[in-house]
């Protein structure tokens, strides 16, 4: 009888090509993390279609995104629309501040032609996007409701704005109309909607009016008061940018130790996806949901 080869954890049975016990454990942990990480489409599948358009969000749902991210701004006549910038100049064929324009003014603009111009630089024939008029949050909520599966929504309030707290007031009114301002189903079931902001004041307004809605504190840098992993009072989820995670990977552990979930934005490069998986983040917010899902073995 041939002797059974032995090896200690951390080694590999080279002759048989079998991974060691520690490698098996590492791979199992990595696989589990990949399956658990939520993939969030940043402004829709915005690498493939014009950001914040129905086309981008439809593509994200088709690609299998777990959640959709959007920015909301209030128009002059009180409608919440999905636009990132304060002004429409970059992403439409118009000009002016969203807060100074009425919905009818925005509806007359093309929010897809800039992407066509961008695509034409690398292709002889640019794509002909459909559904690229301004997108209201109401229409996006309808799309999610009709998705045929659970699709969560991460809504970012943009501040400062001339409308201040009216943004949160209108947002909660709209969520209430869709039955999304309070837990649905089992009492401990996670909410399908969360509200994000760089403004702690915005999140406090949401918490005061609708304490069951999860909130996310977004960060471009880590302020001294939050270096130990603390967040503004009552906020359960941290939203650091990928630059923070690259420069200070240990910060994720501090946030986790403080009991917070970690949702990282905007994660587009494969090496950054690997970094986030290794650190055990809870959500990856990306312009490329299909590519990230594929990298996580879920595509």
What are the functions of these language-model segments?
Residues 3-299:
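Phosphate-group recognition and catalysis centered on beta-loop-alpha active-site segments
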């Amino acid at each position: 009888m041939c002797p059974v080869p032995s090896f200690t954890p951390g080694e590999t049975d080279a002759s048989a090509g079998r991974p060691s016990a520690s490698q098996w454990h590492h791979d199992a942990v990595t696989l589990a993390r990949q399956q658990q990480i939520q993939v969030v489409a940043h402004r829709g599948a915005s690498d493939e279609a014009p950001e914040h358009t129905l086309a981008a969000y439809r593509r994200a749902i088709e690609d299998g995104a777990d959640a959709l991210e959007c920015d909301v701004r209030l128009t002059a006549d009180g409608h919440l629309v999905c636009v990132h910038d304060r002004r429409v100049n970059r992403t439409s064929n118009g000009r002016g501040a969203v807060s100074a324009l009425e919905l009818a003014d925005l509806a007359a603009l093309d929010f897809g032609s800039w992407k066509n111009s961008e695509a034409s630089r690398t292709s002889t024939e640019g794509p002909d996007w459909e559904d690229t008029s301004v997108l209201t949050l109401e229409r996006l909520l309808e799309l999610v409701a009709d998705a045929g599966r659970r699709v969560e929504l991460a809504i970012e309030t943009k501040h400062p704005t001339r409308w201040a707290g009216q943004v949160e007031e209108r947002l909660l009114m709209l969520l209430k109309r869709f039955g999304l301002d309070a837990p649905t189903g089992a009492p401990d079931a996670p909410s399908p909607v969360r509200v994000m902001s760089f403004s702690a004041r915005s999140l406090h307004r949401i918490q005061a009016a609708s304490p069951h809605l999860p909130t996310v504190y977004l960060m471009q840098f880590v302020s001294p008061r939050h270096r130990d992993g603390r967040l503004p009072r009552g906020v359960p989820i941290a939203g650091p940018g990928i630059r923070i995670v690259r420069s200070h990977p240990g910060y994720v552990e501090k946030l986790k130790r403080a009991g917070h979930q970690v949702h990282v934005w905007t994660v587009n490069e494969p090496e950054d996806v690997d970094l986030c998986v290794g650190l055990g983040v809870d959500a990856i917010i990306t312009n490329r949901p299909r590519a990230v899902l594929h990298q996580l073995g879920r595509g």
